[in-house]
Amino acid sequence: MRIKNNNVNYIYMVITILVMTFSMRATNNMVITTTPLLAKIDLHFSEFYVGIISTVIYLFMFVVTFYINPRLNHKLRKKLFITANAALIFVLLSYFFADAITIWLSSAIAGLAYGIMLPNLITSSSLLKDQKQRERLISLYSVGLSLSLILGPSIEYYLLTIVDYRYVFLFFIPAVFVGFITSLFIKFPETKNETRKNVLKNDGLKAAMLTITTYNIPFAALSIFLTLFAISRFHVSGSVAYSPYIYFFSVSLATRFMMMLRPFKSIRLPLIFSIAITGLVLSLFPFIPDFTAFIVLMMLLGIPHGSIFPISTIMISRGTTLEQRNAANSYFMGYNNILFMIVPLIFGYIVGVIGYENSFLVLLIPVVISGIYLFKIYGENKMFFPGNKKISASKSL
């Protein structure tokens, strides 16, 4: 009976997390990628101010994830989680009516909402005590992220063929409503001894931060400027320029699905491979001959996008206790928000000076530095790199 109850509980967590992940991440990606287009094309912002409007979203996400969420108990976090999902319905409506002034307020509120949602959803996906089940659920969560990032851009790609950017926000409201209903059933940790003491010094968190740096610096730039780069370089329409996201996230989904089916106990070789692909693709950006070649490069970048995030979250789950995990995930997401806040701003400025192609080449520098530092500090850490033996998928459930 206990085994049956455990299976029912596991299935319940899988369903609620996957549905919540789709609602949250599909709309989050839409807001992050469409707001710059609305600012640039409808409101005539410069590249620099396009970078700033994107920074506003991540600034408010950072404030919540880094300073507020780690200090809240699980009961209050759950109430705010539900409230944030409800608030997003009104945020999408406000984007539809936004002008050059109100778009800043809409972006700030969106950042606050996602700041409470993202770290708590990651924590909910890592509650299980059994390591194999926990890492399988983390992989399923990552698969849900990628699936939402395929269906979301696919829907937006179709919508942009029939409506302008403002109406896209309206069409995503039903997905947010589903997320609001699902948020009522998401499980939160019930431990009474949650702590954030010394979490910033935790090796699992620090290794995860270095790992995510190897990819999220270029991805922070791509998530904001990919469509604008495609329009500028290849002179394609807005809907066509948006289409590389679909191929990109499809490869990411395939990568995460394979990691779910055949998880590795050691992540050394997959991590090295992912960092190498990122560096290779960035070095080829100045030499892209046509739009088809651009799509191929984006598909290659989908591999590290699929692998780096789940590897980072697995590092946190291996290196922290349940009592530390909310704070660790909050600080981890806060760090990501810093990257997505600073990189677009700097990248937007650099683009205005040296152009898109050379700007992407500059992104190689932090990728290489963070990768080298990661393996120098943690390359022999057996908690993260115990060997290359695979964990049997059949025994993970």
Segments from the language model and where they lie:
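Helix-loop boundary and gating motifs at the non-cytosolic
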Residues: 8-53, 58, 216-233
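A late C-terminal transmembrane helix in Major Facilitator Superfamily
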Residues: 324-354
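Cytoplasmic helix-loop-helix junction between adjacent transmembrane helices
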Residues: 108-143
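Structural signature of the two symmetry-related core transmembrane helices
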Residues: 79-93, 269-283
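C-terminal membrane-cytosol helix-exit motif in multi-pass small-molecule transporters
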Residues: 173-191, 373-378
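Interfacial helix-cap and linker-helix signal at transmembrane-aqueous boundaries
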Residues: 39-40, 71-73, 155-163, 230-231, ...
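Loop-to-transmembrane helix entry/capping segments in MFS-fold secondary transporters
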Residues: 47-48, 131-141, 238, 322-332
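Helix-to-loop junctions at the C-terminal end of transmembrane segments
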Residues: 64-76, 255-267, 351
